[in-house]
């Protein structure tokens, strides 16, 4: 890809010229279980671009997408890029009031929504003064809700338009990031960022190949999922298995058996659940996975080691962000050190700084800053937040890390999750990692809580494995003391049914502090 061209030329149109038109690009594992070849994607995305033109869409107008993982997602995303418009994929798990806020904030002129999501989305569209059309992706010919247009009718008889010219530095798409606090921010990315992540993590770490079959637990609308399931496989002409449902362990096992993915992209909570289920079943799983990736939260050492024993392949754990589009700090295949986030991905640089922006020494905790080719242009309508996050070439992540003597980076927690006990920093993640190594514990979250003297101490919330009884509190406290130190052990152990999480599986510790 020429860094000064529309990303759709490289990721879609190029495959026709290189003879991959008949190869399957996307295969649905649920719903209608359809397939979409590279050739058909090129045609249908060009037709969607034509439909946008027909509806008066101009360059850089936003096309909001509340679309589950299904064939139409890549058609709409790449079709919008071909037309010079800006696709804005939204989390499909949000509430109506959040959708309303985002639709108003983005000023989207066209909304494309899956029919299964319409009842939640409908209130968000009422009274919207920016939308010119609401397009519902319907699975049959039974009709669509009043005031909307079916996807089939929207694109019917539309001409297949040629991909518009665009510079690599032109805005291409937005992703709304809520982080762990739930306040949506529009993160603006340019055309060249997609190939930048494919060339760095996709090619040089993951080693994505044309003969790979990829399955990503993270959905398309996440930055992590967009790379895993779309830009990485499409950069080499591979095939992606898409699943719009909830990725339960049983669903994951079914996909492994039926669709035989070679690359599996998950998140720590899902890996933990799948490992626990396989251990419950006994034996080894049926699979064809050559490599797995994890992001969203730091992967606990215990989970990585148990997975590798069962699956016989590594989980390459790393850290990325919506602002950087994908993973920029990662372990490497054949060199995975569980409990660390590895080393900078080729093409990226990182720093650890203190509260005065001075570099910290080896073993000291500092905030992680990153710079590289996929950094966002900033937030939409969030000038102050943009200025405090994007500082010149460097992007603040809000993550606290320390560096080992071997140069590897160890996650300590979010800036607002860290706390001091007796004047010493405590990493919630370190305590949580010790807790889940205690027999019977599936998940754990640690937050600060004042004791009777109003001194801050660690408090733990734990989820037990199915069929396991609550642990003896003193036994688990003693276990953690022995593993990581006297001042770090949790003074309170609360057993809960589940932990609050974001849609990406990140633990929302702020809800436990409230």
Question: Locations of the language-model features?
Answer:
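Conserved AMP-binding/adenylate-forming core of the ANL superfamily
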Residues: 22-70, 74-78, 95-100, 152-153
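Conserved AMP-binding/adenylation subdomain of ANL enzymes
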Residues: 195-216, 221-262, 277-278
């Amino acid at each position: 890809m020429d860094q000064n061209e529309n990303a759709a030329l490289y990721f879609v149109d190029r495959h026709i010229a290189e003879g991959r038109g008949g190869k399957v690009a996307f295969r649905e594992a649920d719903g209608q279980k359809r397939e979409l070849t590279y050739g058909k994607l090129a045609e249908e995305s060009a037709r969607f671009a034509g439909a946008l033109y027909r509806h008066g869409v101009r360059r850089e107008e936003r096309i909001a997408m509340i679309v589950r993982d299904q064939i139409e997602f890549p058609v709409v995303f790449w079709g919008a890029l071909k037309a010079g418009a800006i696709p804005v994929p939204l989390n499909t798990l949000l509430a109506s009031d959040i959708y309303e806020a985002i639709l108003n904030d983005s000023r989207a002129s066209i909304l494309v929504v899956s029919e299964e999501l319409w009842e939640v989305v409908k209130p968000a569209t009422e009274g919207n003064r920016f939308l010119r059309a609401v397009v519902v992706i319907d699975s049959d010919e039974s009709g669509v809700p009043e005031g909307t247009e079916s996807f089939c009718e929207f694109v019917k008889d539309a001409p297949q338009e040629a991909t518009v010219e665009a510079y690599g530095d032109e805005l291409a798409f937005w992703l709304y990031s809520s982080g762990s606090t739930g306040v949506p921010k529009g993160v603006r990315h340019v055309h060249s960022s997609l190939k930048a992540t494919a060339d760095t993590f996709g090619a040089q770490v993951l080693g994505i190949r044309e003969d790979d079959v990829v399955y990503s637990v993270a959905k398309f609308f996440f930055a992590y999922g967009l790379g895993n399931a779309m830009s990485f496989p499409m950069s080499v002409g591979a095939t992606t298995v898409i699943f719009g449902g909830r990725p339960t362990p049983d669903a994951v096992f079914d996909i492994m058996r039926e669709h035989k993915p070679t690359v599996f992209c998950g998140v720590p909570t899902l890996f933990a659940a799948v490992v626990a289920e396989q251990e419950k079943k006994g034996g080894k799983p049926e699979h064809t996975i050559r490599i797995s990736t994890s992001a969203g939260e730091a992967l606990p050492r215990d989970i990585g080691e148990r997975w590798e024993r069962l699956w016989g392949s590594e989980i390459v754990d790393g850290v990325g962000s919506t602002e950087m589009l994908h993973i920029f700090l990662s372990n490497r295949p054949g060199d995975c050190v569980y409990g660390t986030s590895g080393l900078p991905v080729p093409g990226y640089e990182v720093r650890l700084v203190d509260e005065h922006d001075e570099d910290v020494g080896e073993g000291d905790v500092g905030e992680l800053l990153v710079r590289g080719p996929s950094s966002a242009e900033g937030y939409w309508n969030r000038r102050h937040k943009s200025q405090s996050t994007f500082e010149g070439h460097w992007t603040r992540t809000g993550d606290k890390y320390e560096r080992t003597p071997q140069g590897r980076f160890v996650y300590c927690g979010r800036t607002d999750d860290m706390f001091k006990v007796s004047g010493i920093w405590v990493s919630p993640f370190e305590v949580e990692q010790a807790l889940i190594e205690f027999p019977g514990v599936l998940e754990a979250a640690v937050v600060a809580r004042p004791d009777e003297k109003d001194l801050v101490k660690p408090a733990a919330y734990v989820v037990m494995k199915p069929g396991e009884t609550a642990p003896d509190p003193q036994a688990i406290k003693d276990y953690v003391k022995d593993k990581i130190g006297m001042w770090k052990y949790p003074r309170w152990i609360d057993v809960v049914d589940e932990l609050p999480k974001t849609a990406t599986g990140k633990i929302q510790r702020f809800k436990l502090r409230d």
